Amino acid sequence: MGEEVSIGATAVGIKTKEGVVLAAEKRVSYGFYTLSTAGKKVFIVNDRLAIASAGIIADMQTLAKILKLNAKAYELEMKRKPSVHAMAKLLSVVMFSRRFMPFFAEVLVGGIDDEGPHLIVMDPLGSLIEDNYAALGTGAKLAIAIIDASYKPDMSLQDAKKLAVQALKAALERDPVSGGGIDLVVIDKNGAREEEVKLQVLI
């Protein structure tokens, strides 16, 4: 029998009154073997919506593509952008339909719509939980401890971004299968924008 192999990744999301921050580290690992330090785990769906994920890169990319195509189709047909909950529900249905051969990915759906900012946490079977902040993946316990200690509902989006980076750095330092730099997406009323935080590599 083959030995069990952990798929490493850590992603976090933080919601504020101004918007949402999604962030993930960039290392792609298989067990304790690093395949790449430039893996993309944060994806912009449109200028109001993005996802961050932990799991297998191929499954993350597939889910992101499904969401992008359906968001665009909805916008073309309805002449308006879909709500965050509508897109999360669609993704939930897709993931649940594969429950006997599930996607190996946990997903954070973040965005802003007419009802305000939203952060939705999804497990590989598509369960939906809306929360103010969350962490997924192998470094989740380390990251969530940092966010728990510093999160404030009235914090600024800039402070939320700093907290997300701080949480991921904590995970990167102690989780052997997380690492590389950090990709972020910041979503507010002005749109969604990507940023990258490069980290010093310690050997």
From Swiss-Prot:
Underlying gene: psmB2
Top-level enzyme category: hydrolase
Transmembrane intervals: none
The protein's name: Proteasome subunit beta 2
Propeptide residue intervals: 1-9
SUPFAM superfamilies in UniProt: N-terminal nucleophile aminohydrolases (Ntn hydrolases)
GO terms of biological process kind: proteasomal protein catabolic process
Cystines in this chain: none
Species: Pyrobaculum calidifontis (strain DSM 21063 / JCM 11548 / VA1)
Recorded superkingdom: Archaea
A molecular-function term among this protein's GO annotations: threonine-type endopeptidase activity
Major localisation: cytoplasm
Catalysed reactions, as listed in the record: Cleavage of peptide bonds with very broad specificity
Keyword Cytoplasm: yes
PROSITE patterns reported for this sequence: PROTEASOME_BETA_2 (PS51476)
UniProt keyword Coiled coil, yes or no: no
